[in-house]
């Protein structure tokens, strides 16, 4: 007797998201966006769209890495900090959200024409955020 394996159709975006209770909706949407090259808005609007097998395999690999402790920012290759997108990898410290307070406090205290030296602070996100927000301040 020849028994053929019954194939299961890949899930829709929404079905995949609902099957991942350990991930937040944001985490799911960001991973879906990565494998589909779609914005989060497009993911939400097209929630009934079906994943193809390549996308599903890539999502499964990303989920395994995430569950083993790889930061989401490393999987995505970027992290937003103070409204700016920074490329990140395991070779770069991921800018932390609470560090945005340091930028806010610095911006309040720095006057135009002053110079700031950023030395050995990790990714440089603090310096870039200050320079972006206060263009008349010299940041090195």
Question: What is each model feature region?
Answer:
Residues 1-19, 69-81, 130-131, 140:
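Generic hydrophobic segment detector
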Residues 1-44, 48-51:
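Non-catalytic accessory regions of SAM-dependent methyltransferases
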Residues 24-31, 67-73, 119-120:
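Short, functional N-terminal and low-complexity linear motifs
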Residues 25-29, 80, 139:
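Short N-terminal secondary-structure initiator segments
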Residues 33-108:
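Conserved AdoMet
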Residues 98-140:
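Conserved SAM/SAH cofactor-binding pocket of Class I
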């Amino acid at each position: 007797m020849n028994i053929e394996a019954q194939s299961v159709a890949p899930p829709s975006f929404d079905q995949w998201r609902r099957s991942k209770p350990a991930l937040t909706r944001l985490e799911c949407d960001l991973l879906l966006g990565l494998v589909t090259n779609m914005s989060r808005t497009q993911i939400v609007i097209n929630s009934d769209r079906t994943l193809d097998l390549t996308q599903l395999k890539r999502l499964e690999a990303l989920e395994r890495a995430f569950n083993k402790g790889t930061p989401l920012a490393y999987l995505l290759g970027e992290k937003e900090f103070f409204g700016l997108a920074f490329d990140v990898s395991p070779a770069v410290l991921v800018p932390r959200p609470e560090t945005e307070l340091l930028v806010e406090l610095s911006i309040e205290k720095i006057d135009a024409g002053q110079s700031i030296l950023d030395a050995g602070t990790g990714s440089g996100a603090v310096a870039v955020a200050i320079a972006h927000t206060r263009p008349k301040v010299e940041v090195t």
